[in-house]
Amino acid sequence: MKLLKRLVSVFAIVLAVGSNAFAGDEVRIVIDEGVDGARPIAVVPFVGSAPEDISKIVADDLRNSGKFNPIAVSQMPQRPTSAAEVNPEAWSNIGIDAIVIGQVVPSGNGYSITYQLIDTVGASGTPGTVLMQNSYTVTNKWLRYGAHTVSDEVFEKLTAIRGAFRTRIAYVVQKNGGSQPYEVRVADYDGYNQFIVNRSAQPIMSPAWSPDGQRLAYVSFENKKSQLVVQDLNSGARKVVASFQGHNGAPAFSPDGSRLAFASSRDGVLNIYVMGANGGTPTQLTSGAGNNTEPAWSPDGNSILFTSDRSGSPQVYRMDASGGSATAVGGRGSAQISADGKTLVMINGNNNVVKQDLTTGVSEVLSTSFLGESPSLSPNGIMIIYSSTQGLGKVLQLVSADGRFKASLPGSDGQVKFPAWSPYLTK
C-alpha cells in the first residue's frame, strides 16, 4: 500500500496555506518521567539508512502513549532483520513478548518502509508468528508520517485502541520580541513539522479544531477588541464570526462541526452562547449571577461542560446543549470529555490536571506541574497535552492518561500555551 496519495490528500492543508510560514524553532519532547511500569517492547533498529530514524520515532511514539516501555538497543539480545532471523526464546527470556523489525530503503524519489510485528511468546499460537506487517512508499518529506503510521498500526494491534500518532496539535506562541510576537502554530503531536497559521501584533488565544481538522477557531485581539476568528487551514481564509461588545472567547466546535459554543460578555456578564460555525445570531445558554466560560461539548453533542464561578469559586458544570439548569461536576475548570464519553479531564483546585471516571466518579491526579492550564485529550484518550509555568514562562507538557509517562515540550523562541489536540486526520 502506498502512502503518497493519501499523504497529499490528507495533509494538503499544510502545504496550501499560502500566507503561512514554517517556523524554525520547534517544540520538542523532553522526557520528565519514564514508563517503568508499562509493557516492555523492542523496536529493533531498522535496516537501511534514511534522513529520519524510523525505529526511534516508532519507539518514541509507543513510549509517549504510556502503554509501552521500549527497551534500549544495548539490551537487545539480537538485531534480526527478518522474521526468519528472530529467536523468540532470546526475547521471551528477557520479558519481551513482541518486537518490531523493519527496513527502510531508497525507492524512486523517496523511501520504502517495511515492518513486521512479531509475537515472541506464542500468545497468538506459535512463537515467532508475524502478527502484522505492512509496507509504504513515502517521499523524504513524509518519512516521519510513515513512521507514525507504523506506530499507529502496531499500537492498535497490541492494544485494540486506535493510534493517534498521526495527529497534530495547535497552540499559541508568544515570541520574545518582534513586531508580531503572537502566533498560532500547528505541529505534529510530538512537536515536529511546525508551521505558522497566523501571526499578530495583538494577543491570540484558545485555538480549537473543527471535527474534520480543516479549520481552527481562535480568539484574536488584532482590532483592539476580542473577536472570534475561524480560519480555513486549506486556503488560509479567515472570517471573523463573533465581534460582539465586551469579551468574546473560548470557542468550541460542536461534534458535527455545524455550531460554535463560546463565551461572551455582550450583555455585561460572561455567559455561554451557541451560534452557527460561520457566525450568525447567537443563542444564550446560561444566565444569572456569576461568570460562565470555557464551553466543551460532550461527544454526542447533547450536553456542554463549562466553567462557572456562580457558587463563589470556579467549578465545572454540565448542562443540556440547549441550555437550562446545570449540574456541578467538580474541579476548577478547563474540562474536556474523552471521545468515548467515559473520562473527564480538567484542572482541579490545585491547578493540577486530573482525570475523572464518569462511571465511578473516581478522580486521579495526572500532573503536579506548576499552574497547569488548558488540558487537551488526544482523540483516542491515551495522551493529554496541557500548558504549565516553568520559571517565568509557559511550556507545553505531555502526560499519558494513565500517568506513567510525562514529558515537556519547551519552546525555544517564546512562551507556549493554549494547546489543542486535533481530531484524527487520516482517512
UniProtKB/Swiss-Prot annotation:
A Pfam short name: TolB_N
Listed Gene3D superfamilies: TolB, C-terminal domain, TolB, N-terminal domain
Entry keyword set: Cell cycle, Cell division, Periplasm, Signal
Principal place of residence: periplasm
Biological-process GO terms, alphabetical: cell division; protein import
GO CC entries: periplasmic space
SUPFAM superfamilies documented for this protein: TolB, N-terminal domain, Tricorn protease N-terminal domain
Cellular localization per UniProt: Periplasm
Protein family membership: Belongs to the TolB family.
The name this protein goes by in its record: Tol-Pal system protein TolB
Species whose genome carries this gene: Haemophilus influenzae (strain ATCC 51907 / DSM 11121 / KW20 / Rd)
Gene transcribed to yield this protein: tolB
